[in-house]
Amino acid sequence: EFADNLDSDFKVRQFLAKELAKASVSRIVIERPAKSIRVTIHTARPGIVIGKKGEDVEKLRKVVADIAGVPAQINIAEVRKPELDAKLVADSITSQLERRVMFRRAMKRAVQNAMRLGAKGIKVDVSGRLGGAEIARTEWYREGRVPLHTLRADIDYNTSEAHTTYGVIGVKVWIFKGEILGGMAAVEQPEPAAQPKKQQRKGRK
């Protein structure tokens, strides 16, 4: 049963990614409560997904139900700040690269927008034949702090690919939103065991 669910989840994601390519979809969450499927689409442009009077969502629901073979429910969640969502930032950079915008300008714009909206730090990494160069290379741009080794750091990471006339350019984005301090049980430090006192020897007179 798990294998079947995994396969249908993959097909649902594939279908939605293709259908909603222009709807700025950040992520798709699939849940399976008792013989049904619930799909939550996180998007920056809910109007495009919903369509006129909810027509488009109804079409999606029918197709998802057919793929999964169980009744489907589709929820739309709006992403309020797309500039602070790593997937949407990466997709925005790739769409600019495909429109032949200079890669440095696209990177800088994304970084400035994220920092303006309250990100603690952001790093953008692009690799490939940048600017149509013969030899592929990697360039990155960072502003603020991006602590990748700090476990409590809330870092949003995602990737995207730009298909240009020169080949594929990979884009990676890390956005540092702050540190998660609550929610973790504090580990009590064990008290050091009492050291036995050394008996002082009386010196010989």
UniProtKB/Swiss-Prot annotation:
The keyword Ribosomal protein applies. One of its GO terms (molecular function) is rRNA binding. Pfam families: KH_2, Ribosomal_S3_C. The keyword Ribonucleoprotein applies. It comes from Buchnera aphidicola subsp. Acyrthosiphon kondoi. This is Small ribosomal subunit protein uS3. Belongs to the universal ribosomal protein uS3 family. HAMAP family: Ribosomal_uS3_B (MF_01309_B). GO terms for biological process: translation.
